[in-house]
Amino acid sequence: MWHLLVWIILLATAQQMITEGCPAGCQCNTPQTVFCLARKNSNFPRSVPPDTLNLYVFENGISSIEESSFIGLNGLHLLDLSHNQLSSLPGGVFRNLANLSNLDLTSNQLTEISADTFQGLSRLERLYLNGNRIRSIHPEAFKGIESLLELKLSNNQLVTPPAFSLPHLLLLDLSYNAIPVIQQGVFNAGNIESLRLAGLGLKEVPEELLSGLKNLHELDLSDNQLDKVPPGLHGLTKLNIAGNVGFSQIQVDDLSNLPALQELDLSGLSLQTLPKGLFRSSKRLRAVSLAQNPFNCVCSLGWLSEWMRVSGVVLLRPDETRCHFPPKNAGKTLRQLRDSEYGCPAPTTIQMPSTMPPSTTTGPPTTTKHLQTEAPTTASTTTTTIPHQEQEEDTQPFQFDFEDTLCPPQTCLNGGSCHLDPTGQLECECPPGFQGTYCETGPVTPAVVTEMYIEQVKIIEVTVSSIRVDLQSYSQNKEKLRAIRLTVRNLYGADRRPMIYKLPPTLPEYTVRALSSNSSYWVCLGSQGEGGPEEDLCTETHTLGEPPKHSPQVTQSQEGNLTLVLVPAVAAGILLSAAVAAAACYARRRKGKGHSVEDGGPLEMDGVKKGLDGKGEVKKLSEDPTGPEKTGAESEEPLMDSTRIGNNNDAPTGRLPHSYF
């Protein structure tokens, strides 16, 4: 009876293993998380374990989903369907996912959002729809998902956005749509902290448009058509107005209401100078970007270098922050420019014209030629005398031919040609393979790493056989991120081939398993966006030295996943059957030995046991005519002759071979 109970337990365990198996082509190495990344199957994965909380179906080529796709997944918290080919979503397709809090539909082919698309998602907090072809959104599309915290709609084809009546919304991204005018009342979400309106074609941002956003901290207005800082901005910690090429002047008062400002991006504008004291009100400023502006590096801009040295503010993209004019400074970076190169006068008294207060410096009295001047118009009646020869030399530099000296050869780098554009601005025409305002960027120039954000790969946890890597801190500041590339390589082991993982950008962390203990690994993170792969950030880490106490877990299932589950179960069943059979055999033999002691068999009655040896002769096994008579226990014979138990070659070994089970 006891072996029957064992069989029942074994079958129940096998059934549980089958039920909780990983879908074909997916990875299930993290509890309650399924990764189906770049799977070679355009159908939605089947047999997803019902206790799954996080399901990543990233870049699978899926073109359609149905409500039945999510049957049994009521506990799902995160669903990543990004980088597929979904062109439409049936109404109520997600209604059974009442516990879903994160839905990522980035980079599909969706064209519209209906009123019931997100029906039933009352707990949804993050909805990512960026990178689609959405032209219209029903006014009631977001009704019923008032718990939403983040909504991303960038890189679509929206012309008129709906009213966002989402009381808990913290982040709204509408960047790179065709919305040249935003009507008042669109932002009915008073708790928004981060608003991204880049690349919409905005010519102005009325003060009343943002007046209701009292908690606004981050504002992105880059790549629009603005010519001034929008009025009425308060409480911002991050302001980005880069890429507004019509923006040619900035005033001190433009930043006077932003004392909490920490990051400011003024790159890609048409600024030729910055007024002294521009950042006086921004006491908390940590980083500023001034790249790709046509700066006129003369005395009026000389204060900037000194301010950067003493303030400690980081200049972002320093190699792209260069002088445009005058010719002697053209192409030089502001960071390398010396104070004396701004052309400011030396701190000594210099001679001035006669209409100004008299100078205390005069020429040598023995060689001076006096010039008669008109009486000064001021109260002073002193006539200044200066050497005529020196006057001609001092004024000569200001009498150059403007057209001949505006575009000297050294202005454009790497063989670029200089000329004036229709607006009178200096412009460089770069040779093939070079780019930038001054042709300073070559074809193999590595990407400039921002000084402020020299990131390191963050390792969350290291064990004897695994490394858990933080992905969120890497991806949070990167725009248009298509995928994260994680590379892990053993530095000193026998197998130093890199292991490369392509992961979705929404994944907060990832655990690399089945690593060698007490080994050094090189861990790198890279990103793949619209601009191609970026330079990796790497770090070295070391797994712990203690050997793992448990067998490594099978992390990936292939098409034969069911077979891999059944084989161990069948093997265990065979082993159990063998054990039961051995026990039964042993019991029968014990019983047989008892009978032989009491009665004895026919051969034993005669004192002989017939058996064939190698020569076919009959041997006596139990009786020795010359020995003393044996009775009781002394007459027992062994069940097996140890001299006849051996391997497949019949060589005597004296013991049974090991079982393969």
Swiss-Prot record:
Residues 293-346 form the LRRCT domain. The lineage of its organism: Eukaryota, Metazoa, Chordata, Craniata, Vertebrata. This is Vasorin. Residues 585-661 are cytoplasmic. Residues 348-385 have a biased composition (Low complexity). It comes from the Eukaryota. It is found in: Membrane. Disulfide bonds join C407-C418, C412-C428, C430-C439. Glycans are attached at N99, N518, N561. PANTHER family: ANTIGEN BSP, PUTATIVE-RELATED (PTHR24369), VASORIN (PTHR24369:SF160). Residues 606-623 have a biased composition (Basic and acidic residues). It holds the Pfam family LRR_1. It comes from Xenopus tropicalis. Residues 348-395, 591-661 are annotated as: Disordered. It is a single-pass type I membrane protein. Residues 455-543 form the Fibronectin type-III domain. Keywords: Disulfide bond, EGF-like domain, Glycoprotein, Leucine-rich repeat, Membrane, Repeat, Signal, Transmembrane, Transmembrane helix. Its main location: membrane. The keyword Transport does not apply. The chain crosses the membrane at residues 564-584. Residues 20-563 are extracellular. LRR repeats lie at residues 52-72, 75-96, 99-120, 123-144, 147-168, 169-189, 191-212, 215-237, 238-258, 259-281. Residues 20-50 form the LRRNT domain. May act as an inhibitor of TGF-beta signaling. CDD domains: EGF_CA. GO terms for cellular component: membrane.
